[in-house]
Amino acid sequence: MKLKREYDELIKADAVKEIAKELGSRPLEVALPEKYIARHEEKFNMACEHILEKDPSLFPILKNNEFTLYLKETQVPNTLEDYFIRLASTILSQQISGQAAESIKARVVSLYGGAFPDYKILFEDFKDPAKCAEIAKCGLSKRKMIYLESLAVYFTEKYKDIEKLFGQKDNDEEVIESLVTNVKGIGPWSAKMFLISGLKRMDVFAPEDLGIARGFSKYLSDKPELEKELMRERKVVKKSKIKHKKYNWKIYDDDIMEKCSETFSPYRSVFMFILWRLASTNTDAMMKAEENFVKS
């Protein structure tokens, strides 16, 4: 607890220095506009309050654009079928562009009369070679056909367990383990993204994500004292999973990123969105990517 308080104090101290540098003698205002608060759901507003209390310098990133995932107007009850479609979309989008993934998904929807097939239908259709051939013609590789079938089997055979698993709280690791163990093609990163966008879990952090790593590098670039402290207090080194290519930004190891992110717990999912925004150099592209992430 003592060490965590020290990290919190360093983050806030570095933030105050940076804000003072930018604002000079102008008063600091970190209260989000009432209209902004009214449009977002309560748990997101609570997250913002917590994050800004820890680091006021993040105010502009939060204030400048709404967060689609947490808008009240986007909140709808999710069914087991919704979760299946979201995970199926994750599989379809792997290793290809967003536009290509949308095109493949649209062809699957067209094949099934205007709606993405539910898991029970796909479970039966994967037993029929002729139907499998039709699905594959939509643009799915052999590997993605295997992955999609695995997902359909998982939901069909374990739907009661899944309903219970997804309906519980504070079981993020259990959800990740179940998905990674039972569904071919779903790894830890994909499972974490589902926790955020599908189950709306608020305390997820993925240091293995390239955008998060880049945003974190920018975040720490003006916090020298915090960086020194994080480096000094390392106990267990967890190497970054990101290959060290010739990036023009510093890649930090996972343990450094995770330790720093703990300051923003239990709202690290929102901190991830902030880091994604810090990583982006194109606001319009960033907002479009967020919208696609919410829909996928």
Curated annotation (Swiss-Prot):
<dbReference type="InterPro" id="IPR051912">
    <property type="entry name" value="Alkylbase_DNA_Glycosylase/TA"/>
</dbReference>
<dbReference type="Pfam" id="PF00730">
    <property type="entry name" value="HhH-GPD"/>
</dbReference>
<dbReference type="GO" id="GO:0032993">
    <property type="term" value="C:protein-DNA complex"/>
</dbReference>
<dbReference type="GO" id="GO:0003684">
    <property type="term" value="F:damaged DNA binding"/>
</dbReference>
<keyword id="KW-0597">Phosphoprotein</keyword>
<dbReference type="InterPro" id="IPR011257">
    <property type="entry name" value="DNA_glycosylase"/>
</dbReference>
<dbReference type="GO" id="GO:0006285">
    <property type="term" value="P:base-excision repair, AP site formation"/>
</dbReference>
<dbReference type="InterPro" id="IPR003265">
    <property type="entry name" value="HhH-GPD_domain"/>
</dbReference>
<dbReference type="InterPro" id="IPR000035">
    <property type="entry name" value="Alkylbase_DNA_glycsylse_CS"/>
</dbReference>
<dbReference type="GO" id="GO:0005634">
    <property type="term" value="C:nucleus"/>
</dbReference>
<comment type="function">
    <text>Hydrolysis of the deoxyribose N-glycosidic bond to excise 3-methyladenine or 7-methyladenine from the damaged DNA polymer formed by alkylation lesions.</text>
</comment>
<dbReference type="GO" id="GO:0043916">
    <property type="term" value="F:DNA-7-methylguanine glycosylase activity"/>
</dbReference>
<keyword id="KW-0227">DNA damage</keyword>
<protein>
    <recommendedName>
        <fullName>DNA-3-methyladenine glycosylase</fullName>
        <ecNumber>3.2.2.21</ecNumber>
    </recommendedName>
</protein>
<dbReference type="GO" id="GO:0006307">
    <property type="term" value="P:DNA alkylation repair"/>
</dbReference>
<keyword id="KW-0234">DNA repair</keyword>
<dbReference type="GO" id="GO:0032131">
    <property type="term" value="F:alkylated DNA binding"/>
</dbReference>
<dbReference type="GO" id="GO:0008725">
    <property type="term" value="F:DNA-3-methyladenine glycosylase activity"/>
</dbReference>
<feature type="modified residue" description="Phosphoserine">
    <location>
        <position position="110"/>
    </location>
</feature>
<keyword id="KW-0539">Nucleus</keyword>
<feature type="site" description="Determinant for substrate specificity and/or activity">
    <location>
        <position position="189"/>
    </location>
</feature>
<feature type="active site" description="Proton acceptor">
    <location>
        <position position="209"/>
    </location>
</feature>
<keyword id="KW-0378">Hydrolase</keyword>
<dbReference type="GO" id="GO:0003905">
    <property type="term" value="F:alkylbase DNA N-glycosylase activity"/>
</dbReference>
<comment type="similarity">
    <text>Belongs to the alkylbase DNA glycosidase AlkA family.</text>
</comment>
